[in-house]
């Protein structure tokens, strides 16, 4: 996932304060600031500060500082970062060396009189290292270039904002860069059968969904069904466009980063993935999870010769999505209907996709 930091630049505290509050409002997780500003920044809201101080959330040093300071910070459990201006080949080599120390979490690179070549070299060199590469940039356009270098791009950017609008635009860029696309396919329903009662989970999010959006949920890790949000008008109950009635406690749900969780694991503050009929995704924050005993229905479908299943609440307001991208209620579902699923080639272990033979029935 791409991230962005903002440099707190200003001649006085009022100017700096506006940068910090805009960063907070734009969901920027980290600001880089002078040590004397740390306490005042913390009074404005819950945001991490990177600075040359052990009081900072991320302890930051410059290239010419004593790097042992970072080792001390790491021993105290702090996240660490080093700022390296790239002015020569020797600076590139130093950045590469620093990444191998084992106590540097973030390397911030500033290019002076250069194009993207040094960044390309370092991204290629540090691809498998446990260190984040952050590019110092002066505009959102530069940030976009940094994020896309060699396809992988830098992990993050440190923006030196010219104005407050730059910060807002960076936030929008990060949101766009972090959108995942999932490949959906069509399965054919073979059985719809009431099976009695069980504990089912409703996911109430901090986002409003629209027609065609829902979440990917299923009993088997190898295929998740697109369960529609409660956005469809009906004569029985008001719409709940923030909600997906997801299924029983055992079911998997697809979360950001192509990870899954059990529905029973979800809690307020967790992030889930909203998916539309075309496979476009966006993150949502869980606001509440409700687990209640309700009547259930088994849905069985065939996909490329394989039988896949999921279980949902047996109620008119619970819907899957058909091959046309339209919501279809489980009470209207019948054998032969086509529904959208996300097939998965790999098995799952602690929510991670792995190459392993697992039989699910």
UniProtKB/Swiss-Prot annotation:
GO molecular function: 3-dehydroquinate synthase activity; dehydroquinate synthase activity; NAD binding
Domain of life: Archaea
Name of a matching Pfam family: DHQS
Reactions accelerated catalytically: 2-amino-2,3,7-trideoxy-D-lyxo-hept-6-ulosonate + NAD(+) + H2O = 3-dehydroquinate + NH4(+) + NADH + H(+)
Protein EC: 1.4.1.24
Signal peptide: none
Family recorded in the similarity comment: Belongs to the archaeal-type DHQ synthase family.
Name listed for the protein in its UniProt record: 3-dehydroquinate synthase
Organism of origin: Methanocaldococcus jannaschii (strain ATCC 43067 / DSM 2661 / JAL-1 / JCM 10045 / NBRC 100440)
Gene: aroB'
